């Protein structure tokens, strides 16, 4: 008795029914592939008439701007090269192959135009054919291979980091001339719909142009499609890490002239600023394009700052030399007094304290009168004071007062007593040796104090001259810093307006 098998599950039947069309479609594509490539030769140009060219529609899509090497003058890009042409050998009727209208085949199986990058600097000139091409039943072939190109580009870093670059990419057939391949540009510029924004460069525009050139090597005319890539460097990174620190260093250099000379730290501040700038330059050397063709704008600014700081050190040393001058080492010329003590302070609205100027004549008059009195005291003969020999000009107030008293006293004594009494009284007025010695000592001290005050006044004048020089260079360096910075960084704007 036979074994009765149970009927297959419904799910199994449904799965088989679903796989039948897939298998049928795969079989149709297999038959179509065999039909298309049975006698196909990928070396022969796909034209029915040899005299006709193959029309190639060409477009470049920018995927990413990888890098711009300023030193080696190379631009690295990630591109998609869209190429569309018609191959009459790759036509079929969809009805014969279960409605199959499109088919993807390996690119090495079909004929392809040998379009290369003429100005390639490194790597392969031609794209890799590992990607597949899309075939349409009408014979239209669409091939979009991705490629990373390193193209040569003339980099002008004059206005770095505010520079604009124009890099060209020239595509064309290496083997086929105009009679064999006719290149047609799709659109008027590079396709940037799938562009991945770069952190350093911004693409302004990328127009494309078609050229026909006759080279020296050949008689034929060759076509090419050239894209001009206008790019602008994004300066934010360099502004924060290069320009702003240099501006701060320049500002510290200006403050050197505002620092008082008496503090003794002017040269220390100058040297510290110079050392900080030197270390800063060593750190950023690799950031700046190392080229000897032109001096980049940021290099000019760093050189300007270095000269700025060095010049401030030289001027500071000169100012300190003026500040510490004394009457024993230098004599102030008349023109220095006229220019630096009278003219320039008024021009720069500097006001010198008036107390010193008012007290100086009083001090000189006081010491002059006291020394005159001490000279009268030091006379050994009281008769000279009595007769008024040293006091005829009225400069000795003490002698004049003493002479009047002695004259009055002598007159009274004359009326009341004999001449011998008068001589006795006058003899008592003579100074003792101890008093004379004390007067000489006081006179010496007074003369020294007068000389010290005169020397201090001259030293104060030299210090004020140094202060005036400091103030002059303070304003000069502020103007140079502002105008120099503005002049350097306005050059890119002016150059862009000219172009």
UniProtKB/Swiss-Prot annotation:
Key words, A-Z: Cell membrane, Disulfide bond, Endoplasmic reticulum, Glycoprotein, Golgi apparatus, Ion channel, Ion transport, Ligand-gated ion channel, Membrane, Metal-binding, Phosphoprotein, Receptor, Signal, Sodium, Synapse, Transmembrane, Transmembrane helix, Transport, Ubl conjugation
TM region positions: 245-260, 263-279, 302-320, 469-487
Single GO biological process annotation from the record: locomotory behavior
GO cellular component, one term: postsynaptic specialization membrane
Membrane topology field: Multi-pass membrane protein
Disulfide bond positions: 153-167, 217-218
Chain positions recorded as Na(+) binding sites: 265
Tissue specificity annotation: Expressed in the brain (at protein level).
Catalytic activity: K(+)(in) = K(+)(out); Na(+)(in) = Na(+)(out); Ca(2+)(in) = Ca(2+)(out)
Glycosylated residues, chain numbering: 49, 166
Keyword match Endoplasmic reticulum: yes
InterPro entries named among the record's database cross-references: Neur_chan_lig-bd (IPR006202), Neur_chan_lig-bd_sf (IPR036734), Neur_channel (IPR006201), Neuro-gated_channel_TM_sf (IPR036719), Neuro_actylchol_rec (IPR038050), Neurotrans-gated_channel_TM (IPR006029), Neurotransmitter_ion_chnl_CS (IPR018000), Nicotinic_acetylcholine_rcpt (IPR002394)
Cytoplasmic topological segments: 261-262, 321-468
Extracellular side: 26-244, 280-301, 488-499
Post-translational modification summary for this protein: Ubiquitinated; by STUB1/CHIP and thereafter degraded by the 26S proteosome complex.
Tree of life domain: Eukaryota
GO molecular function, one term: transmembrane signaling receptor activity
Subcellular location(s) of the protein: Synaptic cell membrane; Cell membrane; Endoplasmic reticulum; Golgi apparatus
Signal peptide coordinates: 1-25
Activity regulation details: Activated by a myriad of ligands such as acetylcholine, cytisine, nicotine, choline and epibatidine. The heteropentamer CHRNA3:CHRNB2 activity is blocked by alpha-conotoxins ImI, ImII, PnIA, GID and MII. The heteropentamer CHRNA3:CHRNB4 activity is blocked by the alpha-conotoxin ImI.
Gene3D superfamilies in alphabetical order: Neurotransmitter-gated ion-channel ligand-binding domain, Neurotransmitter-gated ion-channel transmembrane domain
General function of this protein: Component of neuronal acetylcholine receptors (nAChRs) that function as pentameric, ligand-gated cation channels with high calcium permeability among other activities. nAChRs are excitatory neurotrasnmitter receptors formed by a collection of nAChR subunits known to mediate synaptic transmission in the nervous system and the neuromuscular junction. Each nAchR subunit confers differential attributes to channel properties, including activation, deactivation and desensitization kinetics, pH sensitivity, cation permeability, and binding to allosteric modulators.
Family stated for the protein in its record: Belongs to the ligand-gated ion channel (TC 1.A.9) family. Acetylcholine receptor (TC 1.A.9.1) subfamily. Alpha-3/CHRNA3 sub-subfamily.
Quaternary assembly: Neuronal AChR is composed of two different types of subunits: alpha and beta. CHRNA3/Alpha-3 subunit can be combined to CHRNB2/beta-2 or CHRNB4/beta-4 to give rise to functional receptors. Part of a complex composed of STUB1/CHIP, VCP/p97, CHRNA3, and UBXN2A that modulates the ubiquitination and endoplasmic reticulum-associated degradation (ERAD) of CHRNA3. Within the complex UBXN2A acts as a scaffold protein required for the interaction of CHRNA3 with VCP/p97, this interaction also inhibits CHRNA3 ubiquitination by STUB1/CHIP and subsequently ERAD.
Protein name: Neuronal acetylcholine receptor subunit alpha-3
Biological source species: Mus musculus
